[in-house]
């Protein structure tokens, strides 16, 4: 079970975007990276291709960030928080915040 999943709200805890919040767009488990919206935005210079109708120019896009630089956002404390995994009575696994022991998904 992954501690951070697609659709989670996260806080950046290290790097040039430290302190910013965003939603996870995509998870790359083999690289241990996450794509977070409006975080780690870079500018790419693209050459136009008139044969295919593509315009050139400067394009901004998000790049993946390593999952160690991200913490799950806890709405109760309004901060980034560490996450653990616990087995419930029915045998299923659930994620919980380590600061206040509340379940992440309910």
Swiss-Prot record:
Keywords associated with the record: Ribonucleoprotein, Ribosomal protein, RNA-binding, rRNA-binding
A GO BP term here is:
translation
Quaternary context: Part of the 50S ribosomal subunit.
Protein family (similarity comment): Belongs to the universal ribosomal protein uL24 family.
What is known about what this protein does?
Answer: One of two assembly initiator proteins, it binds directly to the 5'-end of the 23S rRNA, where it nucleates assembly of the 50S subunit.
Designated gene of the protein: rplX
Gene Ontology terms, MF aspect: rRNA binding; structural constituent of ribosome
Q: Does the keyword Translocase belong to this entry?
A: no
Coiled-coil stretches noted in the UniProt entry, renumbered to this chain: none
This chain's protein is named Large ribosomal subunit protein uL24
What is the top-level taxon of the source organism?
Answer: Bacteria
Q: Which Pfam families match?
A: KOW, ribosomal_L24
> CDD domains under this entry?
KOW_RPL26
Q: Which GO terms describe its cellular component?
A: ribonucleoprotein complex; ribosome
Q: Which InterPro entries match?
A: KOW, Rib_uL2_dom2, Ribosomal_uL24, Ribosomal_uL24_CS, Ribosomal_uL24_KOW, Translation_prot_SH3-like_sf
């Amino acid at each position: 079970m992954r501690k951070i999943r697609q659709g989670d709200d996260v806080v950046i805890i290290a790097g040039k975007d430290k302190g910013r919040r965003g939603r996870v767009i995509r998870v790359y488990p083999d690289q241990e990276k996450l794509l977070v919206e409006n975080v780690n935005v870079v500018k790419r210079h693209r050459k136009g291709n008139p044969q295919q109708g593509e315009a050139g120019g400067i394009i901004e896009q998000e790049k993946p960030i390593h999952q160690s630089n991200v913490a799950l956002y806890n709405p109760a404390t309004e901060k980034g928080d560490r996450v653990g995994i616990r087995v419930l009575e029915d045998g299923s696994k659930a994620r919980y915040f380590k600061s206040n022991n509340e379940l992440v998904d309910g």
